[in-house]
């Protein structure tokens, strides 16, 4: 299993880092078999697998439950777990206790925090306490309730400078990596070159040190629409939906199960069953 020191070396050597989300045992198993470098148990699970319209309702118990399943499916892959909405915006002590709970109970190797500002101090204190932290700047889904959109961030000179300053701040605080989401590719390239820690892009161009995409987006599973930055490598819904419809049709028509799908017993053992022929 790769560790933070390996990710630093990959950046230094120009080797791209691959990260894929996973939310359960089978998806984690798939990701590990694909030899991805990292797994992100994102609070995006709230929208992707729990059916919420945002990440806000996701709880710590949700994140722990899903991370434990992921760990069983991918025991040899570095796992990063999101700290969900408002679990790191109270006191430093509360943040440390919440991170401790996630790491100890789920087995996650690192936690991910969105944003900067007061979050920078939380990253520093978690790092001091021995908890690896991945930072996240640009489009931060937990803040969409305030911003009101999933549009590209940091397109103006002022916003770009602010993001650069924040990136340098989270690095100085001790973050082991930085996710850059939905920002101009030119800015992502400059940030990646300015930092010594790896950058993981999603909708941030090819010049980041690595890339992350959602498992379901990659394979086309349960997706109603894809963002511009997503490439579809498969569309398994096209196979799943007809398969399920065929099952329903065959059960209704009594053509499933066939004899080959059934178990049998000797006829003589049936005779006199319960005293009846």
UniProtKB/Swiss-Prot annotation:
Molecular function, one GO term: magnesium ion binding
Residue numbers annotated as active site: 181
GO annotation terms (biological process): pantothenate biosynthetic process
Residues annotated for Mg(2+) binding in this entry: 43, 82, 114
Keyword Cytoplasm on entry: yes
Listed HAMAP family: PanB
Record-given protein name: 3-methyl-2-oxobutanoate hydroxymethyltransferase
Organism of this sequence: Listeria monocytogenes serotype 4b (strain CLIP80459)
Lineage, top ranks: Bacteria, Bacillati, Bacillota, Bacilli, Bacillales
Name of encoding gene: panB
């Amino acid at each position: 299993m790769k560790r933070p020191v390996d990710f630093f070396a990959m950046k230094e050597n120009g080797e791209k880092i691959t990260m894929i989300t996973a939310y359960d045992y089978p998806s984690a198993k798939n990701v590990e078999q694909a030899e991805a470098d990292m797994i992100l148990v994102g609070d995006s699970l709230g929208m992707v697998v729990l059916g919420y319209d945002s990440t806000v309702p996701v709880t710590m118990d949700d994140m722990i439950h899903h991370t434990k399943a992921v760990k069983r499916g991918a025991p040899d892959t570095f796992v990063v777990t999101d700290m969900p909405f408002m679990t790191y915006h109270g006191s430093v002590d509360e943040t440390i206790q919440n991170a401790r709970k996630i790491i100890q109970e789920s087995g996650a190797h690192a936690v991910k925090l969105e944003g900067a500002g007061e979050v920078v101090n939380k990253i520093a204190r978690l790092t001091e306490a021995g908890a690896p932290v991945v930072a996240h700047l640009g489009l931060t889904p937990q803040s969409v309730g305030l911003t009101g959109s999933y549009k590209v961030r940091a397109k103006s000179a002022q916003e770009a400078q602010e993001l650069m300053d924040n990136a340098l701040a989270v690095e100085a605080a001790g973050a082991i990596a930085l996710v850059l989401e939905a920002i101009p590719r030119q800015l992502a390239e400059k940030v990646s070159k300015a930092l010594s820690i790896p950058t993981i892009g999603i909708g941030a161009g090819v010049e980041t040190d690595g890339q992350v995409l959602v498992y379901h987006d990659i394979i086309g599973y349960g997706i109603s629409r894809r963002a511009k930055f997503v490439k579809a490598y498969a569309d398994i819904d096209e196979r799943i939906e007809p398969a399920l419809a065929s099952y329903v049709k065959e059960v209704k028509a009594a053509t499933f199960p066939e004899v080959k799908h059934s178990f049998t017993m000797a006829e003589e053992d049936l005779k006199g069953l319960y005293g009846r022929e």
